[in-house]
């Protein structure tokens, strides 16, 4: 999948060149992958509830079917993502896009300095940065085969959602292009998990060699995960740190690495 460093690079280029930013979430992406007929067949039990719907699985000769053979990828199949990306990458190359040697999930096409496009693929999510008519042309090309999810794209005027991150590009009164990244849902979840900040917390500098996994004692009591789910908290913090809160990423990574 697309690395977060590549995502930041794409957003920096959008700032430098005042380029358009779009986000597309592919609807039912994994269902578009096709299984190779030469691979061993994948047998499936008929889904529960077919009898209640009045549907009885049958073979071509009319006998009752006790299993199905999958012909295309489905959600839950281990290689569904791989099959989808193989098909989708072929689709991207059909638009004249080339695969980056730096990040295989970054695709680009440059016609000239005023017409270029970058497409970052993160599973079934696409981040698009470009100038000129190529962005519109690609969206029309995309609609010819795939369908966009209803909850993807522009959330509010000028604000696009990508991987749960709100991306807003704006121009200041001095003509400076800036991008704001935020995620109200993740921050709301963090507040629900953490509650009010305890008053007895002590700030410590994360210097080299500091011991973070201090054994439990009277002064350092062990707190149940039912009271405070530390793993979930630092999972959200790490995502926030890698995606847009770069200032707290180092601290979160150091603490998360000491969790056992």
Where are these regions (language model features)?
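Long, low-complexity, charge-biased intrinsically disordered regions
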Residues: 1-260
């Amino acid at each position: 999948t697309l690395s977060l460093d590549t995502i930041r690079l794409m957003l920096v280029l959008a700032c430098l060149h005042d380029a358009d930013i779009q986000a597309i979430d592919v609807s039912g992406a994994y269902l578009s992958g096709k299984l190779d007929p030469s691979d061993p067949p994948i047998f499936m039990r008929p889904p529960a509830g077919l009898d209640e719907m009045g549907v009885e699985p049958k073979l071509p000769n009319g006998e009752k079917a006790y299993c199905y053979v999958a012909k295309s990828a489905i959600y839950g199949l281990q290689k569904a993502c791989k099959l989808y990306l193989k098909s989708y990458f072929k689709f991207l190359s059909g638009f004249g896009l080339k695969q980056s040697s730096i990040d295989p999930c970054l695709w680009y096409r440059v016609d000239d300095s005023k017409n270029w496009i970058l497409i970052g693929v993160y599973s079934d999510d696409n981040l698009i940065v470009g100038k000129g008519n190529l962005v519109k042309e690609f969206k029309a090309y995309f609609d010819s085969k795939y369908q966009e999810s209803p909850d993807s794209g522009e959330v509010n005027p000028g604000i696009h959602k990508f991987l749960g991150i709100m991306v807003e590009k704006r121009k200041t009164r001095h003509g400076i292009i800036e991008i704001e990244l935020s995620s109200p849902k993740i921050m709301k979840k963090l507040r629900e998990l953490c509650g009010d900040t305890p008053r007895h917390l002590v700030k410590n500098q994360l210097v080299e060699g500091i011991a973070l996994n201090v054994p439990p004692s009277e002064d350092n009591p062990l707190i149940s995960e039912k009271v405070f789910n530390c793993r979930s908290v630092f999972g959200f913090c790490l995502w926030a740190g890698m995606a847009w809160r770069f200032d707290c990423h180092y601290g979160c990574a150091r603490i998360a690495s000491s969790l056992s």
